[in-house]
């Protein structure tokens, strides 16, 4: 099956965060593609990617970026697909700069912004499953199963002292 989710990042170093997105998409059985697309270094490539995404069969774009983090917003400006922004944790400001860059979008160009770092990367994949589930019931079921397993794991291990 061709990719339904595009996972893009501003630089190769962002893979340490976005790899968690890929891992969760794999667990959910959602087909995806991965690409480095920089809003600042390769803006023409970004515009082309965003403009052609829907025609290539993508239904959701997950965009992770650190620092100025313009990738999710610029991507959202060039597509009508849902764009999920993942702020990458930076050494300088711990990702708060990225979070604020992604979350403060002007009205009319929405970006669904997730948490900073690994949690946001994982949740972006889960949110993708929720979005895709309306059209593709197998991803809704995969998400339900993931949540049930998560609940079961907690209930099976109520004492944190048990290894």
From Swiss-Prot:
Pathway listed for it?
Purine metabolism; IMP biosynthesis via de novo pathway; 5-amino-1-(5-phospho-D-ribosyl)imidazole-4-carboxylate from 5-amino-1-(5-phospho-D-ribosyl)imidazole (N5-CAIR route): step 2/2
Keywords for the protein's UniProt record, in alphabetical order: Isomerase, Purine biosynthesis
Enzyme class comes to isomerase
Q: EC annotation?
A: 5.4.99.18
Recorded GO molecular functions are:
5-(carboxyamino)imidazole ribonucleotide mutase activity
SUPFAM superfamilies per the record? N5-CAIR mutase (phosphoribosylaminoimidazole carboxylase, PurE)
Residue sites binding substrate per the record:
11, 14, 41
Q: Which GO terms describe its biological process?
A: 'de novo' IMP biosynthetic process
Q: Which Gene3D superfamilies match?
A: 3.40.50.1970
Q: Which reaction does it catalyse?
A: 5-carboxyamino-1-(5-phospho-D-ribosyl)imidazole + H(+) = 5-amino-1-(5-phospho-D-ribosyl)imidazole-4-carboxylate
UniProt key word DNA damage: no
Question: Main role?
Answer: Catalyzes the conversion of N5-carboxyaminoimidazole ribonucleotide (N5-CAIR) to 4-carboxy-5-aminoimidazole ribonucleotide (CAIR).
Name the NCBIfam families for this protein.
Answer: purE
Which family does the record assign? Belongs to the AIR carboxylase family. Class I subfamily.
**What's the name of the protein?**
N5-carboxyaminoimidazole ribonucleotide mutase
Source species: Pseudomonas aeruginosa (strain ATCC 15692 / DSM 22644 / CIP 104116 / JCM 14847 / LMG 12228 / 1C / PRS 101 / PAO1)
Gene that produces this protein: purE
């Amino acid at each position: 099956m061709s990719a339904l989710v595009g996972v893009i990042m501003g630089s190769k170093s962002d893979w340490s965060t976005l790899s968690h997105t890929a891992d969760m998409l794999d667990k959910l059985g959602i087909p995806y593609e991965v690409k480095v697309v920089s809003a600042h270094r390769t803006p023409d490539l970004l515009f082309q990617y965003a403009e052609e995404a829907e025609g290539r069969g993508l239904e959701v774009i997950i965009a992770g970026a650190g620092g100025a983090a313009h990738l999710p917003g610029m991507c959202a400006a060039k597509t009508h697909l849902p764009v999920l922004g993942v702020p990458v944790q930076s050494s300088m400001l711990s990702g708060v700069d990225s979070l604020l860059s992604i979350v403060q979008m002007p009205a009319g160009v929405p970006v669904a912004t997730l948490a900073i770092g690994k949690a946001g990367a994982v949740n972006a994949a889960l949110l993708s499953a929720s979005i895709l589930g309306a059209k593709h019931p197998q991803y809704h079921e995969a998400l339900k199963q993931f949540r049930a397993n998560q609940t079961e794991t907690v209930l099976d291990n109520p004492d944190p002292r048990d290894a």
